[in-house]
Amino acid sequence: MAFTGATLTTSTIAATAASGPLMDYLWMLILGFIIAFVLAFSVGANDVANSFGTAVGSGVVTLKQACILASIFETVGSVLLGAKVSETIRKGLIDVEMYNTTQQLLMAGSVSAMFGSAVWQLVASFLKLPISGTHCIVGATIGFSLVAKGQEGVKWSELIKIVMSWFISPLLSGIMSGILFFLVRAFILRKTDPVPNGLRALPVFYACTVGINLFSIMYTGAPLLGFDKLPLWGTILISVGCAVFCALIVWFFVCPRMKRKIEREIKSSPSESPLMEKKNSLKEDHEETKLSVSDIETRSPVSEVGSATVPLRAVVEERTVSFKLGDLEEAPERERLPSVDLKEETSIDSAMNGAVQLPNGNLVQFNQAVSNQMNSSGHYQYHTVHKDSGLYKELLHKLHLAKVGDCMGDSGDKPLRRNNSYTSYTMAICGMPLDSFRAKEGEQKGEEMEKLTWPNAESKKRIRMDSYTSYCNAVSDIHSASEMDMSVKAEMGLGDRKGSSSSLEEWYDQDKPEVSLLFQFLQILTACFGSFAHGGNDVSNAIGPLVALYLVYDTGDVSSKVATPIWLLLYGGVGICIGLWVWGRRVIQTMGKDLTPITPSSGFSIELASALTVVIASNIGLPISTTHCKVGSVVSVGWLRSKKAVDWRLFRNIFMAWFVTVPISGVISAAIMAVFKYVIL
């Protein structure tokens, strides 16, 4: 349907340009419009993940909501900001004056460049590999020029500047995102009560976002809106005025409403999270309670307490986290051992057998059924949730809502630990038999299902029951309780940091529920800002060669001074939106979830700083890569949160893809250009 519309559009365009001096090459113009639409489709399927990937990954918006918002802002951004970068792509990379007497070669080169870029981006989207659309079109443009005119046809000085920008853009974006997140964490996230400072900062955040966005639109000089006639001082005055007005609106209307909403959420959920069950028990000082295991066996899992003696305080708050993931079944009551409440000064070895009281007075209970398993089978059983599974998304979303200390769970819950090698969260599900991990009805079980190894095996073996909606399971031999404790300590990274609450913060640096509410709207706004900037910058990747093709056909002048037509930018924006709806979810999953866990606060920092970098580059006509900016910001903020929170293996793969994209798209474009030059023309 979309391609039929593209064909009808090209027919209409061809009819209006029928009086041009190159009427014999009308077929090339029509072919160029079709390929340009495919290229725009591929840009939407791959590059749009940069804009809303983090918002979807943090759970702030759904995929459908992201597609709707991106469709609006990508299109508007392509119309208002895209013209200037299109000029750089059209004239900045090659010397178009060399084609004065061979206009048909320039037209063929434009078609070749679009084809080479589109093919490689479609392949990359199929492989869920985020690449740079700017890299593609630059490499393809150089490829056809080398075939058409040799090395003299390329402006190598401009190419060097562009290559430098590919490395400078992630560095600058990363620095800006890191500074912003550092300030947010220092003045908001790390406060005992983050709400007051967060509400005070809201007007500033909104004002900066709106002011920068408006300045970008007006400074670019969108002819459609008459902004090209505004002087610089007028642009600055209008932008600052609108930013101040927005700040006042937020301060007097949005902040009070947000404060009331947060208060309602806290009142309706005393535990500060819908996942938590908070129990307030009044107990007298110096009172000691001793319960035997036989007495506990008849109690519910939530009230299970071991035989340890604990001095109880006047008011003790016990918080537990309950996760319900997929079709998981709780272990039978008889397979669970009771939790034990221990003193705050206890070692990690003792903590593995009971519960720990955090410095803030909260009593966190640990799930404990390992001893029972070891006594019966001599094995320690654990299951890993794969980062690409459906459960990982649900688990990650719930981790964002739960506070750090509460994520350890109670006697019926699953303690969480970090698996660095896969960059995924791990559930140590104690007391749960392997056969409780059953594939859902209709799930694929083909070659992805490997031979099962049951807990009574003598040697260490890995079990894989893994597709995108199932689990990675593992079974390890552990012959003594001390060995088990050492392995768990090493896996959690606690080491000798006994009783350290900062180690928990390092692993579970998640937003508090009220902070999540505070930053949700901001992340949506900054994501829209990023989508707007992306539309302005990356629509040129699809439309730049088409603009050259159309203007050469229409005027016969390779160095035409005619401004980029607005309807051509709109044409590219529509293609980008369709690509997003049809195929965008593949790369969104890679960018938004796999590189590093995203929270609303970190997502806001990533979006605002990277979008600011892209918009500035668009305004000075420098074709940078939005992929590089976003990856640089994600890695920078993830590294600040925890060095082990970043999937460095995935980052390495993305970094390698930055280098292979230019030559691959260039080779494809050069091959098509050779066919045009030596066979067709």
Swiss-Prot record:
It is a multi-pass membrane protein. This is Sodium-dependent phosphate transporter 1. Residues 275-290 have a biased composition (Basic and acidic residues). GO terms for cellular component: plasma membrane. It catalyses: 2 Na(+)(out) + phosphate(out) = 2 Na(+)(in) + phosphate(in). It comes from Felis catus (Cat). Belongs to the inorganic phosphate transporter (PiT) (TC 2.A.20) family. The gene is Slc20a1. Residues 269-296 are annotated as: Disordered.
